[in-house]
Design a protein with these regions (language model features):
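A beta-strand signature from Gram-negative outer-membrane beta-barrel systems
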Residues: 25-67, 126-128, 141, 147-152
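Surface-exposed loop/interface segments of Gram-negative outer-membrane beta-barrel transport/assembly proteins
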Residues: 4, 60-113, 139, 153-158, ...
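Transmembrane beta-barrel domains of outer membrane proteins
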Residues: 34, 55-57, 132-136, 145, ...
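Outer-membrane beta-barrel channels and translocator barrels
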Residues: 25, 61, 126, 137-138, ...
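Outer-membrane beta-barrel initiation region
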Residues: 79-81, 119-123, 133-137
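Short acidic/polar hinge/loop motifs at secondary-structure boundaries
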Residues: 2-35
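Membrane-spanning beta-strands of outer-membrane beta-barrel proteins
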Residues: 12, 16-17, 47, 126, ...
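A general structural signal for stabilizing positions within well-ordered secondary structure
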Residues: 17-22, 43, 171, 256
Length: 314
């Protein structure tokens, strides 16, 4: 099966799509780049920026074979942005205030020493699993490839789940007449990762939580208007925002050998895509030592936004 990437457009057996994210890399047989004008002529304007032909695996005549491969790994961010600790921050911020003619800041209620990057980052686990079954005779061929990818992100609550399928078959009715089909599909759940920007800006003098109430701690008054506690994004918001995508692309074809070097081929192609998203904004309460009772509400209301889109091209 040939996938042809044409100026950011993909062709799969005469079907042009916007990307090939439904392909499992384990099903790719080879890749070829076309650059010369003579090779690109048949693609017209779609090939203006070049063509990449991706050939996926198909069955070969021989015994039925089952291949299984699996891998696991971990990922961690080592090269983090250097930030100040609590004592360094207090010194530098007071220097700024004094140079502006203001009094030093009162840190009595702000005794934390938080590395916010440690709070939102994690060591992510990932696994990639693939199974393929192939078989062929003189009359028929089939190939089935299944894939599953699970990858935890470097940010807590971030997790990707992706299932892929590649199925193709070809049957020879006679020596000159053949039929077949190709089907590729994907089901993917994508995470909503947040909190990195806040982790780089939040003052280290604030603790993550209030020990008595268990509420997420607010930031000092000089930051509250611009920056929230990064855990609000990762624990309260990012954990509730999800999107799920489905996509199926395929075709059926028939071809007949008219003459020795002349073959007629008819193809019907289809591309179906569906996307569902859910965004939940909860009521957010934090601990603020500057208000009576300590408990403060940051948001006025909770809301749920859901979206669904479907497209079909043939």
């Amino acid at each position: 099966t040939d996938f042809r990437v044409l100026s950011c457009t993909t062709r799969i057996h005469h079907l042009y799509t916007d990307n090939i994210n439904y392909l499992n890399t384990a099903d790719i047989e080879s890749m070829e780049i076309l650059k010369d004008p003579s090779s690109l002529a048949i693609f017209g304007v779609r090939g203006a920026n070049g063509v990449i032909i991706i050939t996926t695996k198909r069955a070969k005549i021989g015994k039925t074979m089952v291949n299984i491969n699996s891998s696991v790994g971990w990922k961690v961010i080592y090269d983090r942005v250097g930030v100040t600790n609590a004592e360094e921050f207090k010194m530098l911020y007071n220097e700024q205030l004094i140079s502006q003619g203001s009094d030093p800041y009162d840190y009595t209620q702000w005794t934390g020493n938080t590395d916010w990057q440690n709070e939102i980052f994690q060591t992510g686990f990932l696994t990639n699993n693939n199974v393929s079954i192939t078989g062929a005779t003189d009359k028929s061929k089939f190939y089935l490839g299944l894939g599953y990818v699970m990858e935890e992100g470097s940010i807590k609550t971030e997790k990707l789940n992706k299932f892929t399928v590649n199925l193709n078959s070809e049957y020879s009715v006679t020596d000159f007449l053949r039929f077949g089909f190709q089907l590729n599909g994907v089901r993917a759940k994508y995470p909503d990762a947040k909190g990195v920007d806040g982790a780089l800006k939040a003052a280290p003098i604030a603790p993550t939580h209030d020990l008595e109430s268990g509420l997420i701690h607010t930031l000092p008054d000089f930051q509250r208007a611009q920056v929230w506690n990064p855990l609000i994004e990762t624990e309260l918001r990012g954990a509730h925002n999800k999107s799920e995508n489905y996509r199926v692309a395929g075709n059926v074809f028939g071809e007949i050998d008219i003459l020795k070097n002349l073959t007629f081929k008819a193809t019907f192609s289809m591309d179906y895509a569906s996307s569902q998203g859910r965004s939940y904004s909860p009521l957010i309460y934090v601990y603020n030592p500057d208000v009576e009772g300590g408990k403060e509400r940051l948001t006025e209301r909770e809301s749920v936004n859901q979206s669904k889109s479907t497209s079909l091209a043939a």
